[in-house]
Every structure is written in structure tokens, then in C-alpha cells.
Amino acid sequence: RVSRGLGDVYKRQTYNSFDQIESPSKIGETQLHALNLDWKRFVTHQTADFIHHEIAALREGGSTLPTTANLMHYFGGLDYFKIAKEIDVVSWDTYPTWHKEAVIDTAYDNGMCHDLMRSLKGKPFFQMESCPTSTNWQSVSKLKKPGMLFAQSMQAIAHGGEGALYFQIRQSRGASEKFHGAVIDHYGGNDTRVFKEVSRVGETLKEIRELAGTTVNSSVAMLYDWDSQWAMEDSQGPRNKGLHYLEAMLKFYRGFRKQGVNVDVIDMTCELDKYQVLALPMVYMFKEGFAKKIRSFVENGGTLITSYWSGIADDTDRCYLEGTPHGPVSYTHLRAHETLANL
């Protein structure tokens, strides 16, 4: 059973017990995709367990303050849906690369991540960090044009955020972040353009304080599955220059947002009853429990939208037999006969 789960005795690698399994490494085994996937799941489990016990120690010491952690964009190392279960409030570090591409494209990407952060716990989040001017770690750290800081802060609030905070307040004089942007720069005055724009954000937040505690109602749910992303990133074929999972998600997301439709970004544990539309971009990996939810959703009148490279493998990354797409996406009444990879 262990060998089957790791890839059907691939190249004579038969496992007779769990004691024989080593973690993926440059001096170990890297070709068993199921093993690589389980290792990433294990890392998330260990991190969530660590957070759980750290918070427990604080609670035993008498602290009742809410807990949070600085999450980061679409970080590939941890499944944030599992991490979010251990903390009270979701917050994330928001560093979009404004002015490197069309502003609207950057806004869509940043907006989708806001919606992910809101959806992790289904309640308001915090923009924990944002740069008032320019960072010092991006390949080209472009200065925010006048008004962009205000627009970025209001975007966070519009997507269900309850705070627009900064890193950093006062610019360091030395060390690695001395050129990272701040509310108060090396000049030190309060008469700079940036300081005035930060003040404008603060005054506006006071004016709209009644929005605190409100929620965003979405009729559309879009699946973001870390397991599928990990498995596709590890895949050898059909395209080894990247399968572009997040780009596929953004194509769906742009379509909804252009119509003014709010989107929740969900995982496979989420209930689907309140949604009218379910979007499944590149749902490479199907888990049977979620398959039953989708079947019920469609049978009760919900609209299902999916894409290419869906319903390919089970949760051990073993390919389904008898054709793809497998599972509820077969409601499309389509079957993939061949796969053509584009350049």
C-alpha cells in the first residue's frame, strides 16, 4: 500500500515500511511526486502545529490578545488555509509592483490576494505591511506615483480589510533596510508628499469607520488548491517551463471583476451552499469529499466553470484511468483525447 501511494513501485523502488522512506533532498529521493507532495503537506502541518503550541503558551500565561501572522502574497511554501485555522486574525504583507505593468493588471493580482486573505477565515483581514514609497528588495524598486498609496490602501478596505498599515514608520539610518521606504524618511519632516498622503489615508479611515466589522458578500467562489499547485509545479510534463496556475486563476478573476462581481477564494473544505457560481481553474487534483460537494452544487442549480488540465490525478498524484477530466468536471461532457503543450 505504501509503494502504491508513492507511485506504483516506480523503477523498482518498493517500500515495505514507512521506516524506509526518506524526505526529499538532493542526496535522497526526488522523483516520487507523491512523496514530494506529502513532504510539503508535512511542512504545513508542522508549522501549524508549532503556531498552535506557541499560542497555547501565551494563553496559559494569561494573554487574551488576538493572534496573527504576517502572511505573504501567494506564498508557495505553506497551505495558508491550514495556517489560518490557528490564528485569530489574518494579516498579510502587501507589496504590489506598481508601475511595472499596466496598473489594472497589478490591481487585479493584488485584489485577488486580498480576496484570498479575507476568505481564509471568512472575515475581515489586515493589510499588515505596505510600503509608503518604494521598497529596497524588488529588482527595480519603483516609487509610488502620487495617489497610488491612497488607492492601494483603499483597495484593501474595499476588499474587506480593516486596516492599512505600513512598514516602516521611520526610515532606518543603517543596515539592510536603510533604503526601504517609510512614512518618515531620513529628512525627518512632516511636510513631505508621502507624509501628507499617509495622513490622508488616516483621515479617510476615520470618515469610513462605520465599515469596520462589515463583510463582503460574494456570489462566486473560486478554488485555490495548494495541493494542486504543488503537484503541478513538481510535474514533469506536459510543459516544463511552468503550467502557470496563478495566471489561469487571474484570467478567471479578471472576468468576474470586470462585471463587478465579488469573488471568494476557497479551498476544498469550504461549503458551497451560498454561492451561485463555482470556478475551478486547473483543478488538477480531485479529492473525493470535494467531488461530492460539486456534484450536489450542480444538481441544485449551481453554475460550474472549469478549465483545461482539470481532473487529472487523485490526492496521491496518481493519474485517473478511463479518461479525463475525471470527477464532477465530467459534467461538461468533454473528454481530452490528446494534450498539446504551447510554447
Put a short name on every predicted segment.
Residues 1-112:
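Polysaccharide-binding and catalytic clefts of secreted carbohydrate-active enzymes
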Residues 1-10, 333, 337-343:
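Single conserved hydrophobic/aromatic residue that forms the stacking wall/gate
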Residues 13, 17-18, 52, 64, ...:
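Carbohydrate-binding surfaces of carbohydrate-active enzymes
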